[in-house]
């Protein structure tokens, strides 16, 4: 049986700041050696050369090492997933997941939050965006489900991943071995890596059948409703965090999910919060959350047809500001308006993650019992 989970959201006061994690440990809210995952937003450009993710990663791992007893190698294995880019009102923050000692667990037989982690086999540059990647990711997702004690895919509400994208160095490496890569555009490879990973999640959870190489980035009707995929230069494997609910684990927290049909779909966010177990009025307001919402996690994407609700926009044609940053800022504002809190996890590049032009939403709530 997996252990119950404590989950807290903390602000980042600067890109290298992990003081709020240290404070949680010092105050006895959680133990350094029991931290099993961190998911957060940093204030970089969100692109290939966004090194704020590496800086924040180092800061958090240094606190875990200094405050706990795990070896550097053990701390290095803790999944810490940073999504770069806090465009608009989105505020840099981290959501920290830690297991709870049995003697401190709130007992209940109701479904409660459970977390499982896994790492895939090495993803070679020639794998990215192809069925080799999908197969390796799917296997790792199943490992993470087992780690979370989840047997029914319906109990999985959020799968956060971090995978490698392509760089000039890895493209050259593939070519030196006589291999080809899906694209030589490094920024485009971010969307590609995320999309291929999402299809792997969808396969693992039975949402779709195994796709072909040709389906990747093209057959947008193939998607996962719970995938949240990020990519970067920090690793060469798929780092998987599966978050769901299980009976018997105990604890105060529960997760739910839904999808946004488009960037303005506030109802999709509220549906995820309801699915997590909060009772809300027919037309809810942020005041109705009453401090029980821990965080929401969203992916977003500019619709390939260049419209929202029949109105055209210029995001995909804008040469000054990439559409990644524009849609993230838009959805970040919509989400913050719902939650009343700009510290929300909104990540861009949602190919095969939720419906075309929309994206998946997960919500974690504190039920207090």
Swiss-Prot record:
E.C. code: 3.5.2.1
Residues that, per the record, bind substrate: 53, 83-84, 194, 230-231, 328, 347-348
Stretches for region RU B: 112-247
Superkingdom of source: Bacteria
Chemical reaction(s) catalysed: barbiturate + H2O = 3-oxo-3-ureidopropanoate
Residue ranges of the region described as RU A: 2-104
Recorded coiled-coil stretches: none
An annotated GO BP: uracil catabolic process
Catalytic class of the enzyme: hydrolase
Pathway: Pyrimidine metabolism; uracil degradation via oxidative pathway; malonate and urea from uracil: step 2/3
Cited InterPro entries: AtzD/Barbiturase, AtzD/Barbiturase_RUA, AtzD/Barbiturase_RUB, AtzD/Barbiturase_RUC
Residues the record marks as site: Important for substrate specificity: 324
GO molecular function: barbiturase activity; metal ion binding
Domain notes: The monomer structure is formed from three repeating units (RUs) that share the same structure as one another. The monomer and the active site possess nearly threefold rotational symmetry, to the extent that the active site possesses three potential Ser-Lys catalytic dyads, but one of the 3 active site surfaces varies in composition suggesting it is involved in conferring substrate specificity.
Description of how the protein assembles with itself and partners: Homotetramer.
Protein's name in the database: Barbiturase
Source organism of the structure: Rhodococcus erythropolis (Arthrobacter picolinophilus)
Taxonomic lineage from the root: Bacteria, Bacillati, Actinomycetota, Actinomycetes, Mycobacteriales
